[in-house]
Every structure is written in C-alpha cells, then in structure tokens.
Swiss-Prot record:
One of its GO terms (biological process) is dipeptide transport. It is found in: Periplasm. This is Glutathione-binding protein GsiB. Pfam families: SBP_bac_5. The keyword Transmembrane does not apply. GO terms for molecular function: peptide transmembrane transporter activity. Keywords: Periplasm, Signal, Transport. Gene3D superfamilies: Dipeptide-binding Protein, Domain 1, Dipeptide-binding Protein, Domain 3, Periplasmic binding protein-like II. The complex is composed of two ATP-binding proteins (GsiA), two transmembrane proteins (GsiC and GsiD) and a solute-binding protein (GsiB). InterPro entries: Peptide/Ni-bd (IPR030678), SBP_5 (IPR039424), SBP_5_dom (IPR000914). Its main location: periplasm. Residues 1-27 form the signal peptide. It comes from the Bacteria.
Amino acid sequence: MSVMTIQRRWLVAAGVTAAMVASPVWAAKDAVIAVGSTFTSLDPYDANDSLSQTVAKSFYQGLFGFDKDMKLINVLADSYDISSDGLTYTVKLHPGVKFHDGSAFNAAAVKVNLDRASNPDNRLKRYNLFKMIDKTEAVDDLTVKITLKTPFSAFVNNLAHPAAVMISPAALTQYGKEIGFHPVGTGPYRFVAWNQTDFVKVEKFSGYWKAGLPKLDSITWRPVVDNNTRAALLQTGEAQFAYPIPFEQAKVLEKNDKLALVASPSILHRYISMNVTQKPFDNPKVRQALNYAINKDALIKVAFSGYATPAEGPLPNSIDYSVKYHPWPYDPAKARELLKEAGYPNGFTTTLWSSHNHSTAQKVLQFTQQQLAQVGVKVQVTAMDAGQRAAEVEGKGVKETGVRLFYTGWSASTGEADWALSPLFATASWPPAQFNTAFYSNPQVDTDLANALKTTDRAEKQTLYKDAQDKIWADAPWIFLATERLVSANSKKLTGFYVMPDTLFSFEDADLTE
C-alpha cells in the first residue's frame, strides 16, 4: 500500500471526523457503540477477531446466518438442497438484492466470493472454513451449485459463519488486497470511513432490500480499550451501547436508571490448555490433578464476578451436539495424590501464558497461580497482547513452541460441534494450522470427527460427537474452567441491539427513541 494511499485514507477519515462534529445530520439517529478493542480488518475472510466481524455485519451479509439464539436462518439464500451423496449443495438466492455500489447480487457474485475464499493461494485467515469446496457454479442468476471435495455435513453452518459474507465482485476487482479498507456489501448500512484508532462510521443504505430497515441513520463504532473509559462514555450519554462491561463495574451501571445492564448466555468457553507433548503434561494423572486443583466456583466469583458457569464439558451446552458432564470438582487432596502417583510428590515448575491481558484475564492468571501453588505447582505467568499471541502461540509448531499452560477461550460461531471441536482437538489442528494449543492427539477422536462430517443422520452424528467428547473429557488436555455470560449495557433509548451467544452483535432492527 503506497504512502499516498494511506495519507488519502487518513485525510478522508479526518474529514469525516470534522463532519461528525460540525454537522447536525450525524446526530439525527447515530448510535455510538463502544467496544473493547480496535479492529484488525474489514474483510471478514481475513479477520480472526469477533469485533472486526461484528462491525462488518453493518455492511456485509452471507447466504445464511443465525438468530439471537444461534438457530440457523436464511439471509441472502431463500432455500437450499443437498444431494444424496452429501457432495452438492444447490442454493436458491433472494431476488432483487443490490450491492452498495449498485451492482446486482446474484449467483455469479457468490461464485466469485467462494472461489476467492476456497483458494489457498489467497492465504486468507478463514480459509479453513471453505477448504472443503471443490467448485462453485452459477446455474442461473438466482441458483448456485457448490460441490465439495468430500461430504461435510456442517457446511451450511460454515456458510452461516460471520466470515462467509458476499462482497461486491466489482469492489474486489477494483480494490484487490485493499478490500479490507473499502468494504462493499449488501447489508443495511453503507461504509463511510475507518479511522484506524478512533472509529468506523457507517450510514443507512437507502437501497437496502428489506423494507423499513434500517431504522438508524448511522452507527459509529468506537474502540475504547480502557474499561473505565468505556463505562464512562455510556454513563455520560456519549455512547448508547458498550461491550464488554468489566464485571466489577456491572453493579455500578445497574444502578443507573437510564441504562439497561444485560447478562446474555454465550458459547464462549474459557479453558487452560496443557501441552500434552511436553513433560509433565504428557501424563494424564498430572492433567487430572490440575483439573482437581482449581476451584471453579471461586474462580467465577473472583474473576468473573459471578457472570459465568463452571464448564460442563468440552463444549458449551448450547452448541449443537454438546454433551453435558459433571464439572470437575475442587479436590486439592486428590490433586496432590495424583501428582505423587505421577512422580511429582513435590510438584513442579512451569509457565502459564494468557491470550489476553485485560483485567479479567489477569485475575484468572493470579487465581490459577495461587490455586496451583497450593498443590505444589509453581507457575510463571505472562499475559500476552494480540501480537505476542500470534507470534508465540498461533505461529509456532510443536517443535518450536514455548507453550505449556495457555489460558484462552473459544466461541464456535458456526453454532455446530465440528467448529467447536475440530480446530481445538483434531491432530490436524496443531498450530500453526489451527488452534489445538494442547497439541492433543487421539486417533479415535480424529476418526469420530471425520466420520461425523460424512453423515447427515442426526442420531449417527450425535453418537460420534458423544464418543469424541467422552474421550476428550477423560483425556483432559485442558483445565476446563467456565462458560462466560456476556455482559453489555445500553441506553434505554436504544432498542434491538444485543450481543449474540457467539459474542457478535445483532442490530438490524436497532432504533433510537427519544
């Protein structure tokens, strides 16, 4: 990208900032949304973070999506059929839809997007969601045929993932690799500007295909990293919605009669992976001991202010095909006994890294450090920022990695068991390929996960996914911690704006009232 291009973009952004101050038009029905971090890219195919994909929902849509309860819904698709061999998906498209640049959304546009997403040469971060596609064909303007390399029964759920959006082919041709700065989609709002430290601005798209929507004139997405500042913007009325709300401030905001505090159910699972290829974590008794050593109820009280529930399995309960187990009980005596049996009567020393450095992560690290010390395990803790995580955890394979204990979380935005299990537990998902930071490998789990994708029979899938979860729960490659509740707050004047279980937002029906 040239210096001139960067300067031009920043000049445009500065002009928009000035317009926001000088022009009363922006204040008509502008919802200001304060979020917890900056955005990495406005190309959902090349973004790994949920916030970037949430913002992209302003201007982009996919063929399918999820409602607020993570139930699959049609969006730009009207219907679909699957061939008897599970290889071909024929999708009928909604007629009369236009991109923001005036070009038609049609089967040819779907082909362009899926060809781009499934081509490994493009090196897009979300390639794994589309790598099973063999070819995409435009049958006619409103019919697209997608052929897979092998049966993959979770494919429609993958197409409902927030990465699987439809970008204007004309814009892709015009901007190429710069499309992340020039989004053009079919969504309710049109992109205006991105000031990369201060805001993303979108405005109502007058040609939106759903009558009567959107109701807001514009949305300003503001990254506000500091927890106190984010909450303060809400209290002063400078923002109408804020997420995440720091758990320790929830009770303060709850007392403000102009605000609504909402604790939503989630599929955000928190855990500590243990690198099972390294001593002492190659010993299952050590892994079991560490699960017994952590008081999950106390952790939830201390770190999450009660806004979480103990993990009841490898999957959150609301994920399709999840199996519910009894949480690992707190039993430090049992933990010490298991460590002794494993050959570590005096414990051991190791490291604990975190994928985030915010206040909740810091509390989890400190609490875990104290709990493990009580059974003789001494840990040195490091809270990482996004750059460190990408380099040291996601970017290194089993021979180079320094990962031992790693605190992180996962939200399976397809709503289905495959995306909640395969990236985290399959042998093929060891970093840097995907996110199996435990470097866990169980041939039967691999077989179960592969076979579950070859069948569309729900009973058979349930049996296979249950067997995989049974083995993962018993093998304990993680310290299974908690499933978070998602705490947001909003002005009572803002309606129809909420956090979904996968941590993305729903706001198509959002409105501001006086």
